[in-house]
Structures are given as C-alpha cells and as structure tokens.
Amino acid sequence: DVYKRQKQMYEELWKYALDRAKNGACDMLVMDEFMAADRYGLIPHEEAIQFLKEKPEGLEVVLTGRDPSEDLIRIADYVSEIRKVKHPFDCGVYARRGIEY
C-alpha cells in the first residue's frame, strides 16, 4: 500500500529530524512541505506541536507548505504567504525533478 509506505518513510524522516534537532546537530531545521505531511497525517501532529513548543533554545525551525493548521499558526513566530506571480507551468513546463519535487 503506497500510503502505508509513505507514512513509514515520513515517520522515519520525522524521527531523524527530531533526533538531529534535540542533540544539537543543527542551529536551523528546515522541513520543506511540512504542512502537507501534517495535513495528510504522515507525521504525528500532536508530537509536532509538542516539539515546536519545547524545541531546544537557539534552534530556528522553518516549516514550509500551504494551509497550515490553526494551532501551527498560533505557536509560530512568523507566518508568511507566498503567491505565484509567474511559474514555468504556465508555459507548459511540468514538474521537474530536483526543482518542484
């Protein structure tokens, strides 16, 4: 089952990211498309909220993606919206490996 494999992969990545963040291996943790993983239940939402509330001092966390949950917005220091003005897709260029995915 594709969803089950994806969920397992995301959970492994989530655990890896938490471990790196908690052991001081990084000053900044960037999790691209985090909002989609959260929205589709690919990572444990309550665990993510707890981590963000208790993250190590000095650690900057950047979460990207569309439609963040209200509780993520509430605990965030910054929330930005980015809108597309122009994109190669508009000219028929489809998603490219290493760029859009």
Residue ranges and their predicted role:
Residues V2-Y3:
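Short, small-residue-biased leader/transition segments that mark boundaries at the very start
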Residues P68-Y101:
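Phosphate-binding/switch region of NTP-binding enzymes
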Residues A25-M28, P56-L63:
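Loop/turn-to-beta-strand initiation segments
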